[in-house]
């Protein structure tokens, strides 16, 4: 077995463990932990100074970002969300409201609009199955975020997750882009 195949197998096994941990949290705990993450997130000076913020739209047992998106919009910020089209890189598309979403690729809610935002992003709120305290991220295995990060000239990358999704070590490849900051309900 080659090194890359070994890393790929390690990542697949790690994803299974981390997904199971997250999915074993009950709805009440997910809601309270998500509220705590939101509180920590809005204590970031970089978020409060940001004008253009990219934020994933949470699904299932992920840390809920619905309150984050609503609060940012209420503050007058430009909120961008992911849009994935078959065979194309992920795009950052303006969020125009919960009523303007459709079921996108991979079952993830996405804007009806497909035109990418033409400018910079100040801060990126990033999903993941797991993170290390130093910012290493393991996503869902399709590479959309890592490839998109490679196109960004700047922008603070902030990973959000539950504390149970943190691991001291995560298997990585050279294409994996780390976070600048990782926020959980405890930190």
Set out the residue ranges of the language-model regions.
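N-terminal active-site beta-alpha-beta segment that forms phosphate/nucleotide-binding
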Residues: 2-119
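Conserved phosphate- and dinucleotide-binding cores of soluble alpha/beta proteins
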Residues: 88-187
């Amino acid at each position: 077995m080659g090194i890359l195949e070994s890393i790929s197998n390690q990542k697949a096994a790690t994803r299974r463990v981390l997904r199971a941990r997250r999915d074993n949290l009950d709805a009440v705990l997910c809601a309270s932990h998500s509220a705590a993450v939101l509180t920590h997130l809005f204590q970031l000076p970089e978020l409060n100074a940001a004008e253009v913020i990219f934020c994933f739209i949470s699904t299932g047992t992920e840390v809920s970002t619905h309150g984050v998106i609503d609060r940012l919009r209420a503050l007058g910020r430009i909120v961008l969300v992911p849009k994935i089209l078959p065979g194309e890189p992920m795009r950052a598309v303006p969020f125009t409201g919960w009523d303007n979403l459709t079921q996108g690729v991979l079952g993830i809610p996405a804007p009806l609009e497909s035109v990418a935002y033409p400018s910079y992003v100040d801060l990126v709120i990033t999903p993941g199955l797991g993170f290390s305290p130093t910012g290493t991220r393991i996503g869902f295995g399709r590479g959309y975020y890592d490839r998109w990060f490679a196109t960004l000239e700047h922008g603070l990358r902030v990973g959000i997750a539950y504390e149970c999704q943190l691991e001291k070590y995560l298997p990585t490849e050279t294409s994996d882009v780390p976070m600048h900051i990782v926020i959980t309900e405890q930190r």
